Amino acid sequence: MTKASATFGFKDVDASAKAGLVRGVFDRVAKNYDLMNDVMSGGVHRLWKDAVAARLNPQPGEIIIDCAGGTGDMARRFAKMTRAAQERRGGPDALINIIDYNAEMIGAGIEKGGAPEITWTVGDAQRLPLPDAYADAYVISFGIRNVTDIDAALREARRVLKPGGRFLCLEFSKPVTEALSKAYDAYSFKLIPQFGEWLAKDRDAYQYLVESIRRFPDQKTFAGMMENAGFKRVTITNFTGGVAAMHQGWAL
């Protein structure tokens, strides 16, 4: 019987081994994770995240899952926005559930500080510890490419969303022009691992992260995977010429 395989950077590994390998990477980079995103995106990830938060437009009383949300970078944005809406017109507190497979990432996030609306749970995107039709929104930012079975994670996201709930994914993607693709490849493979060695003393972890971006499906392929998982009205918004993309779908 052939064992199931999964990608780990440019390597193909036994599917059963990938989660442990990825956990090892994030154990090592957790304390420098937000710096890592600055390096990998040239700091532009902050604008991309702001755009995702604006698209979500979270409201008081909503239940939001921030999957792979470890350091709380997105959740703090959502909490700030829901509090601002409360100040304008009242309403109950939102509940923002950060679920991350890596305890070190959650620890790094808690050290940075949270908010009353935010909870932190160690959990697997492929088997969420949540009931059906639980949340108003599910957001995953720079996390889904690290999941062993992306299709399973998408089905889980669909399962835990209420009817009318929304799925938003921010992920590094495929540049839309050949010139930009070549320039970003050169930056990624020549400079990012070197920055990882200089800033975090871990070239290999950054090398994996660069490779994992290249193995992730392109925008249209990922949109099709979302549709296969049951999402409707799937849309794609490219950022910085497709260096990153936001995918949105609805649980209808």
From Swiss-Prot:
S-adenosyl-L-methionine binds at residues 71, 100, 124-125, 141. Its EC number is 2.1.1.163, 2.1.1.201. One of its GO terms (molecular function) is 2-methoxy-6-polyprenyl-1,4-benzoquinol methyltransferase activity. GO terms for biological process: aerobic respiration; menaquinone biosynthetic process; methylation. PROSITE patterns: SAM_MT_UBIE, UBIE_1, UBIE_2. Pfam families: Ubie_methyltran. Keywords: Menaquinone biosynthesis, Methyltransferase, S-adenosyl-L-methionine, Transferase, Ubiquinone biosynthesis. InterPro entries: SAM-dependent_MTases_sf, UbiE/COQ5_MeTrFase, UbiE/COQ5_MeTrFase_CS. Belongs to the class I-like SAM-binding methyltransferase superfamily. MenG/UbiE family. This is Ubiquinone/menaquinone biosynthesis C-methyltransferase UbiE. The gene is ubiE.
